[in-house]
Design a protein with these regions (language model features):
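Ferredoxin-type iron-sulfur electron-transfer modules and their immediate structural context
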Residues: 1-50, 112-144, 154-157
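Flanking helices and flexible, charged tails adjoining ferredoxin-like Fe-S electron-transfer domains
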Residues: 54-157
Length: 157
């Protein structure tokens, strides 16, 4: 049957990582580093940069990951990176991670991680509802963007 018919993976299967884009096609990752801190294998590294004028359509917020790498030889596919991410930027998909013959090809950069705008990846089927609800709750400061910001009212005593 294989390769014509592939086996169905378990609902909790954790495979290829993806860096998601928002509805407008901008990258969600703000290089906050929480995924790297949460990673017990220390497989995630990144460098942040400031968004320049004219790049608003590319990056959702003022800070973004100019370099984002996952060392797939170190990754244990625990999923703590996606749980730690406050911006719903990184997810583990149901796709099998491709292998290679050299160590250098096992360090996945943004070229392999950022989802394409033409072929978005549905990651909702792997998520627990309580995680989805928590991440969408705008009362949590880390889920807000500059679009949600309200002016601070001044108290006149």
């Amino acid at each position: 049957k294989y390769p014509d018919v592939q086996r169905e993976s378990a609902p909790v299967y954790r495979g290829q990582h993806v860096l998601k884009r928002d509805e407008a096609g901008a990258e969600r990752c703000t290089a906050c580093g929480l995924c790297a801190v949460a990673c017990p294998a220390e497989a995630i590294t990144m460098e942040s940069a400031e968004r320049k004028k004219g790049e608003e359509n590319l990056f959702r917020e003022e800070k973004y990951a100019s370099i984002y790498e996952i060392n797939m030889l170190r990754c244990i596919f625990c999923g703590l990176c996606e749980e730690a991410c406050p911006k719903e930027a990184i997810f583990l998909t149901d796709r099998i991670v491709p292998s290679s013959f050299t160590r250098g090809e096992e360090v996945f950069g943004k070229d392999k991680l950022v989802e394409s705008t033409e072929n978005p990846i549905d990651v909702t089927k792997r998520q627990r509802q309580e995680v989805i609800d928590f991440k969408k709750d705008k009362r949590h400061y880390h889920n807000r963007t500059f679009l949600d910001a309200k002016p601070i009212a001044k108290n006149h005593h």
